[in-house]
Amino acid sequence: MKVSIEGSVVEVESGASCRDVLKQALSGKKFKKVLAARCGGTMLDLTATVPTACETLEPVYADSPEGLGLIRHSAAHVMADAVQRLFPGVKVTIGPAIENGFYYDFDYERPFTADDLEAIEAEMDKIIKAAHPFERSVMSKDEAKKMFADMGETYKLELIDAVPDDIVSIYRSGDFVDLCRGPHIPDTGCINAFKLMSVAGAYWRGDEKNAMLSRVYGTAFPDEKELKSYLNRIEEAKKRDHRKLGTQLDLFSFQEEGGSGMVYWHPKGALVRAILEDFERKEHLKRGYQIVQTPQILRRELWEKSGHYDNYRENMYFTDIDEQPYGVKPMNCVAHMLIYKSRSHSYRDLPVRLFELGVVHRHEKSGVLHGLLRVRQFTQDDAHIICTPDQLESEIVGVLNFVRDVMGVFGFEYSMEVSTRPEKSIGSDEDWDRATSALVKALEGQGLPYEINEGDGAFYGPKIDVKLRDCLGREWQCATVQCDFTLPDRFDLVYIGQDGERHRPVMVHRVILGSVERFIGVLTEHFAGAFPTWLAPVQARLLTVTDAQNEFAEEARAALMAQGIRVEVDTRNEKLGYKVREAQLEKIPYILVIGDKEVEARGVNVRLRKGDNLGLKTLDEVVDIIRADCEEPFKSGGMRYSFS
């Protein structure tokens, strides 16, 4: 048979391996970078036989995303091998490749330590140098269960039972044996650069009722240069960790005695939040949204009607009031529909755009809670647009333009995904197809690139997920636009059309920032705590050299505050250098020094937090400088910053 490989047609003998065929078609230099093959969307080991129906055989290179995933998956096996060599009696569970590396979960008598990681790395080096080939074999489930039972690997027995087929695949590398679908790299020697990163606890299968395991995280790259670059980014990310900066800048805290996953906003953090929320309210009002406020709890029957009870119950909190069951809202859509239904609507009234900075509660397992990024109580900048089917595309486009303008203010680049129907969902196939088509049509009509994310939509409708990219190249999911034909039907939302008849509207669910808490966490890390001047809780601090300048410092503070500048005064009897350094550590944008010369000139010496010195300026000049700094981010979106 004949197979196409990178534009060349190769004659393939029956039973030939992918390795032999690719080696025949590629140059020696290119072939050295090949880790596996792909045929018809299926990845194959190089030792696998070329399928008889294969028309195109694609090499999978080490520097491709697929190749990187293979390296990391194989590195997880090498790590498990090393752990079994060093810690007799340890049981292995699962070890997949993940976004930035890999992990493996182990059941051992004690948690692993940092010293253990060093020993495991050293043992992995030995295994890699031995270049053990990864060898695939298949056997019946019964044979596999007997083999792993004899090895004492009880977790593997449970995994085998979950396999729907009668046959399972096994991979061997040296003396290590693992249950695995594969594929893998040719041999352990193909792992050129790796690093074990950390240890954490993880429940077996993510269930808190199961055994607590030790999860060892690692990463791997095609070469040392890429690994070093990644490790440098990790170190920078540690410096920017919003949890650390939240304490350093006195923005927020978490009080475990009050409950996990709940944020306590301190004055400066609450001010950042208030400024952000005020910005949101003004921008929504300018775009024709109406601000609403709705209750925290609603009768359970409403959540049953909406489908949340059947499809989202495990993420909700419930309580009884006067012997009536209630649910704490995880989303705002049901309450917004009740507002819409409280009065009749004509086609002339549509679209109706209801906006709420709504506090919601969602039960997240304690193991996934992470600072502001994953909490149990948070505020969504949530809006629901109820419109006619003819208005749907233009409303989606309006939301996408809103996202563009807001992300521009913060300087974020972003990408978009269309997330389609999940397995657990409500509504007809026809409605899902219509909704998905509307989202895709809006994106394509604006010439916006997107990817399809199969099966990740909300249970009531497909959505556009907007993923912003921070200064370290990390992606964060914030904004979403969801199209919903189902809930308007369940709640019998109607409008009177031009024909005088009742018609069913469509509903768009959307957030711009998403969770306000999460967005502030992302902002904190993106800016390393040095918020843009318009968002900084303290925009300027006046520092006196001696007590002789205290009176003028108070006059200057009053004058700046009168112009809408958020300013503090530091008149402590400390050395000026100490006070300047402290202000820089607190990331205050403008440090205004007052000595005798400044008092005489009725001005201040202006220093920036990054160290630049603008020299002596009058107070009016300082106001102009700070205002210009505040206004700059808003220019690209045609927006204006308000000092009110």
Curated annotation (Swiss-Prot):
Q: What is its EC number?
A: 6.1.1.3
Q: Where is the TGS domain?
A: 1-61
Binding-site positions, Zn(2+): C333, H384, H509
The principal location of this protein is cytoplasm
Q: Please share the entry's free-text remark on the cofactor.
A: Binds 1 zinc ion per subunit.
* Reactions catalysed, as given in the entry: tRNA(Thr) + L-threonine + ATP = L-threonyl-tRNA(Thr) + AMP + diphosphate + H(+)
Q: Which SMART domains match?
A: tRNA_SAD (SM00863)
Alphabetic keyword roster: Aminoacyl-tRNA synthetase, ATP-binding, Cytoplasm, Ligase, Metal-binding, Nucleotide-binding, Protein biosynthesis, RNA-binding, tRNA-binding, Zinc
A GO MF term: threonine-tRNA ligase activity
Instruction: Give the highest taxon in the source lineage.
Output: Bacteria
The entry sums up its family as follows:
Belongs to the class-II aminoacyl-tRNA synthetase family.
UniProt cross-references to PANTHER family, sorted A to Z: THREONINE--TRNA LIGASE, CHLOROPLASTIC_MITOCHONDRIAL 2, THREONINE-TRNA LIGASE
Q: Which HAMAP family match?
A: Thr_tRNA_synth
Outline what the protein does.
Catalyzes the attachment of threonine to tRNA(Thr) in a two-step reaction: L-threonine is first activated by ATP to form Thr-AMP and then transferred to the acceptor end of tRNA(Thr). Also edits incorrectly charged L-seryl-tRNA(Thr).
UniProt-recorded name of the protein:
Threonine--tRNA ligase
